[in-house]
Amino acid sequence: MANHQIKAQRRKDEGKGASRRLRHAGMIPAIIYGGEQRPVSIQLNHEQIWLAQQNEWFYSSILDLNVDGAGAEKVLLRDLQRHPYRQLVMHVDFQRVSSDAKLSVAVPLHFINQATSPAGKVGGVVITHELNEVQVSCLPKDLPEFIEVDLSTLNVGHVIHLSDITFPIGVELSTRLDKEHDMAVVIAKHAVIEDDAPAEEGEGDSK
């Protein structure tokens, strides 16, 4: 598992006015909560977070949050608020992580070998990804940045369900599966060709 470090500083002033001043200075108001410690208000460099939030790992990995150079604290991103139309992160929430407590995290799916699968080699076939992430439960040390879904044997007319995915050791779905709740992940089927529009009434009738 790769280490991803985020630098931060403690935030002294709070409130809307203080948060507005932080944003004008190129910083983001944020908070750390969870565990046995009290919540801590912090501030983050906007440029660093803006670049980080463009990567999958920022949302599904354990992050090393270093506040005032005091050493890394293991956290997980729990909320990120963006401005509705500007390239601006408004606020970030981090949750402390305990090494012996299981987490419930949405992990992205990476689909491999689609183009070389039997369905991928047939013209006129549409392969749809019904899910792009799954909610898993695991200890922090077992948390994967992504889960691969191998489509090498996918045929036309086949459906890959959640129960068909191989999860890493120590990782399991957050919800139990049964026949009624085994969601489709990938579907391969022939493209539907719509018929030409019906002729207008009377068109082609002999007079």
From Swiss-Prot:
The ranges of region (Disordered) come to: 1-20
> Which family does the entry's similarity section mention?
Belongs to the bacterial ribosomal protein bL25 family. CTC subfamily.
The UniProt keywords, alphabetically, are: Ribonucleoprotein, Ribosomal protein, RNA-binding, rRNA-binding
Instruction: Look up and give the organism this protein is from.
Output: Xylella fastidiosa (strain Temecula1 / ATCC 700964)
The protein's name in its UniProt record = Large ribosomal subunit protein bL25
Which GO biological process annotations does it have? translation
Instruction: Provide the organism lineage as a comma list.
Output: Bacteria, Pseudomonadati, Pseudomonadota, Gammaproteobacteria, Lysobacterales
Tell me how this protein assembles.
Part of the 50S ribosomal subunit; part of the 5S rRNA/L5/L18/L25 subcomplex. Contacts the 5S rRNA. Binds to the 5S rRNA independently of L5 and L18.
Q: Does the keyword DNA damage apply?
A: no
An example of a GO molecular function for this protein is:
structural constituent of ribosome
**Alphabetized HAMAP family for the sequence:** Ribosomal_bL25, Ribosomal_bL25_CTC
Quick check: keyword Metal-binding in the entry? no
Highest taxon above the source species: Bacteria
Q: What does this protein do?
A: This is one of the proteins that binds to the 5S RNA in the ribosome where it forms part of the central protuberance.
Any Pfam family the entry gives: Ribosomal_L25p
Q: Which GO terms describe its cellular component?
A: cytosolic large ribosomal subunit
